[in-house]
Swiss-Prot record:
The gene is rpsB. This is Small ribosomal subunit protein uS2. It comes from the Bacteria. It comes from Clostridium perfringens (strain 13 / Type A). The lineage of its organism: Bacteria, Bacillati, Bacillota, Clostridia, Eubacteriales. One of its GO terms (cellular component) is cytosolic small ribosomal subunit. Keywords: Ribonucleoprotein, Ribosomal protein. GO terms for biological process: translation. InterPro entries: Ribosomal_uS2 (IPR001865), Ribosomal_uS2_bac/mit/plastid (IPR005706), Ribosomal_uS2_CS (IPR018130), Ribosomal_uS2_flav_dom_sf (IPR023591).
Length: 233
């Protein structure tokens, strides 16, 4: 029984690639055919590759390591946040700030600032400050929350894998993962370079349902791995 069925992939539109003029020739092995100027992805390959990625993510989770979900394009933002939260993992879904992993000490000072502002809002400090200052602080908090809210509890040294939607868009995140030797699992569309990724899941990275389906399977793998870790203890 495969982790993901052909029926699920078809229903979510995972097979629709990009226009033929916008392709990366390295994706040729994952392309089934061309239809009306659009490449159709070979879903048999997707089934197999999704299974490999699932097993890897499950092992990472079972070993007690964390996974960071990265998807900042509009179609990915919600699914990345929801599935990371469901599996109790970390996510970046608005903007990858340079050094998020490779210069975590600097990022940590901004996370501390966000925590401080959260505290001020909760303990009533905002109620006694001048209105103008509160507006300024709330705007600062919103911006920090948007960029760092998904990694507030992150321990960068315990990241065992990165799951990415659209490696072309998230090249900075992938570059940092490479520097730190963190394996990358990604939904790779027909316009991407599969060689940038350790575990390629060939598929449509522009359809909300397609992203949700695959991100959801990665979250399932994490949850299954965590259960295995608890059983081993």
């Amino acid at each position: 029984m495969s982790v993901i069925s052909m029926k699920q992939l078809l229903e979510a539109g995972v097979h629709f690639g990009h226009q033929t003029r916008r392709w990366n020739p390295k994706m040729a092995p994952y392309i089934f055919t061309e239809r009306n100027g659009i490449y159709i992805i070979d879903l048999q390959k997707t089934v197999k590759k999704a299974e490999e990625a699932y097993n890897f993510i499950r092992e990472v989770s079972e070993a007690g390591k964390d996974v960071i979900f990265v998807g900042t394009k509009k179609q990915a933002q919600e699914a990345v946040k929801e599935e990371a939260e469901r599996s109790n993992m970390y996510f970046v879904n608005h903007r990858w700030l340079g050094g998020m992993l490779t210069n975590f000490t600097t990022i940590k000072t901004r996370i501390n600032r966000l925590n401080k502002l959260d505290e001020m809002e909760q303990d009533g400090t905002f109620d006694v400050l001048p209105k103008k200052e509160v507006i300024k602080l709330k705007l600062e908090r919103e911006k920090l929350q948007r960029n760092l809210g998904g990694i507030k509890e992150l321990d960068a040294s315990n990241i065992g894998a990165m799951f990415v939607v659209d490696p072309r868009k998230e090249k900075n995140a992938i570059a940092e993962a490479k520097i730190l030797g963190i394996p990358v699992v990604a939904i790779v569309d027909t316009n991407c370079d599969p060689e940038e990724v350790d575990y390629v899941i060939p598929g449509n990275d522009d359809a909300i349902r397609a992203v949700k389906l695959i991100a959801g399977k990665m979250a399932d793998a994490i949850i299954e791995g965590r259960q295995g870790e608890q059983l081993a203890e």
